[in-house]
Design a protein with these regions (language model features):
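Transmembrane-helix motifs of polytopic, lipid-linked glycan transferases
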Residues: 25, 91-112, 126-127, 151
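Membrane-interface alpha helices of multi-pass inner-membrane proteins
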Residues: 28, 168-185, 191-196, 226-227, ...
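Hydrophobic, aromatic-rich transmembrane alpha-helices
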Residues: 102, 274-311, 338
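Transmembrane-helix signature of polytopic, membrane-embedded enzymes
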Residues: 104-128, 146-147, 163-168, 303
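Specific aromatic-rich, kink-prone transmembrane helix
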Residues: 144-163, 169-172, 176-177, 198-199, ...
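Membrane-interface transmembrane helices that cradle and orient dolichyl/undecaprenyl
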Residues: 152-172, 204-208, 282-301, 342
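Hydrophobic/aromatic-rich transmembrane helices and adjacent perimembrane loops
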Residues: 189, 313, 319-355
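Short periplasmic/luminal acceptor-recognition loop of GT-C membrane glycosyltransferases, typified by
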Residues: 192, 196, 383, 393-449, ...
């Protein structure tokens, strides 16, 4: 099995070192420069949904998406605290990721043989994240979930370190696990892997019987998971929505996998290779620990390896998507294993070679930091500080190659004299943000290639009831719209404005009855 390294729960004599200050400065500057980044695609969708929830909408009834509620809760909280705009969303993301970096720093302060390695962890994890993310990567489920997953692992690790307080730590691990499930149900096998390692420890290291070990594990875990999930279920019960929740979160995803075409395996390979390139410094450092871990592995490192292996499996089974940001699920274990790799390299029989690889990898990471700062700094220098709407939009156009096109697409609907009120977009939800309008119906129009045929009937019914003044259909999505949807569009709407990327339709009929 694995060894158990006895450590204090937290470093009770934590002192902010010069190294900490340097890492905080780098990560803080990167976070500050990321604040005005454009909201793109999913981010815009989540913010629109979060704002609707803040205004009283009920998720899955008044605003519908197939994702579990965790991500919408995060965006609703971010908007409530800091405002429903780019600064508010990315400010919350900076605090969240900063909390992850702080937790890595504090919990692993005495784990490595050289204490300064723990100082580097926030920089290696959060610094890399802020240096390589694209607009659609930031504040996604896979980037946010690293904090509760690591919390789950650390609490389970503490149950090993302090068996006399086992129930308390496993309860907290269950709380973290419940939060993880609110982000994505598909993370359940990943969580089960972490807890299975703990169960094996109880069976083979502590020589507990199967019944005792399972009971000691499941009771506090279950009670902990009820803490975040229970209130959400009670709320939906009060809204009479348990049937809708079951259909959306349990029945629908398998149907989508069965009935919709999967992406080619080449896309998975391509996004995986892209991730390896982006995380190259951590990959090199983590690989240095490989031989050592093969011979002798402790509980925490076992959990990190399980996170990588099962995390990659969780990503691979999501055959309808395979988006690049999915691989940020692997960021935290790669950073922790990179720290272990530094530790191993500096203890090797050839320390000079180890120092060369470590310094080279950290230098590459620093170059990525500087490149990201230079890119955003140059964009701000050309567009002006984003302290007013005009400069902000100019900056975003420079940072996202598609923002000029999106701005052009909403120009017509933003002209004076247009009918105010909600609109509906079959296309990029960033158009809601740029037009400063809300979504007219509950059902989203983002990524229509992932919609079942019957869902188009739901969209038609909701549009017929709401009759928003304008509907926009992006031209690239026309091929995914079933023929039976067009008679409704042509009967109720008329083409009003062509853009290079799509068509605005204006209401031609008023609701009957």
């Amino acid at each position: 099995m694995f060894i158990v390294k006895k450590l204090p729960v937290l470093n009770s004599q934590f002192i902010l070192t010069y190294g900490d200050q340097i890492c905080i400065a780098i990560v803080g500057l990167l976070s500050l420069l990321r604040l005005p980044e454009p909201l793109w695609g999913d981010q815009a969708l989540f913010m629109v949904g979060g704002e609707a929830i803040r205004n009283g909408a009920v998720l899955y009834r008044d605003f519908w998406d197939v994702k579990p509620p965790g991500i919408f809760g995060v965006y609703a909280s971010a908007g409530r605290l800091f405002g429903f705009n780019e600064i508010g969303m990315h400010g919350f993301d900076s605090i969240w990721m900063g909390a992850l970096g702080l937790m890595l720093r504090l919990t692993l302060a005495r784990y490595f043989t050289r204490s300064w390695i723990a100082i580097l962890l926030p920089w290696m994890a959060v610094g890399l994240y802020l240096s390589v993310i694209q607009p659609n990567d930031q504040m996604q489920v896979e980037t946010l979930v690293g904090l509760p997953i690591y919390t789950l692992i650390w609490c389970t690790w503490m149950a090993v370190q302090q068996p006399e307080k086992r129930s308390r730590w496993l309860f907290l691990s269950g709380v973290a696990g419940g939060i993880v499930l609110l982000f994505k149900l598909i993370f359940l096998p990943l969580m089960a892997g972490f807890w299975a390692i703990y169960l094996l420890h109880c069976l083979f290291k502590q020589r507990q019987s199967v019944g005792v070990a399972v009971g000691h594990l499941l009771v506090p875990l279950t009670l902990g998971m009820v803490m975040p999930i229970g209130p959400v279920m009670l709320y939906w019960t009060s809204q009479g929505m348990l049937g809708e929740i079951y259909d959306t979160l349990i029945k629908l995803p398998p149907r989508m996998v069965r009935e919709l075409p999967s992406k080619p395996i080449s896309e998975f390979v391509g996004t995986f290779v892209s991730w390896l390139k982006r995380s190259f410094p951590l990959l090199v450092l983590a690989s240095l620990a490989g031989a050592k871990l093969w011979k002798r592995i402790d509980f925490l490192m076992m959990q990190m390896v399980v996170w990588l292996g099962l995390g990659l499996m969780v990503i691979s089974v999501q055959t309808l998507s395979w988006w690049a940001y999915h691989f940020f699920l692997l960021l935290v274990p790669m950073a922790v294993l990179a720290g272990k790799g530094i530790d191993v390299a500096l203890q090797s029989a050839r320390p000079r070679w180890g120092r060369f690889v470590v310094l080279g990898s950290l230098l590459v990471l620093l170059i990525l930091n500087v490149r990201a700062m230079a890119k955003t700094g140059y964009a701000m220098a050309r567009s002006g500080l984003p302290t007013n709407p005009e400069n902000l939009l100019a900056y975003q156009k420079r940072m996202s190659p598609l923002y000029p096109s999106l701005s052009e697409q909403v120009q017509w609907v933003n002209e004076p004299g247009r009918v105010p009120g909600p609109i509906y977009v079959i296309g990029n939800p960033t158009l809601y943000v740029l037009s400063r309008r809300t979504q007219a119906i509950a059902f989203l129009g983002w990524i229509p290639e992932m919609m079942l045929r019957e869902q188009w009937g739901t969209i038609e019914k909701q549009l017929d009831q709401a009759r928003p003044a304008y509907v926009y259909i992006e031209r690239r999505h026309v091929k995914f719209i079933p023929p039976e949807f067009w008679p409704f569009v042509n009967r109720v709407y008329k083409p009003a404005q062509e853009t290079p990327e799509g068509t605005w339709y204006a209401l031609s009929q008023q609701p009957t009855g």
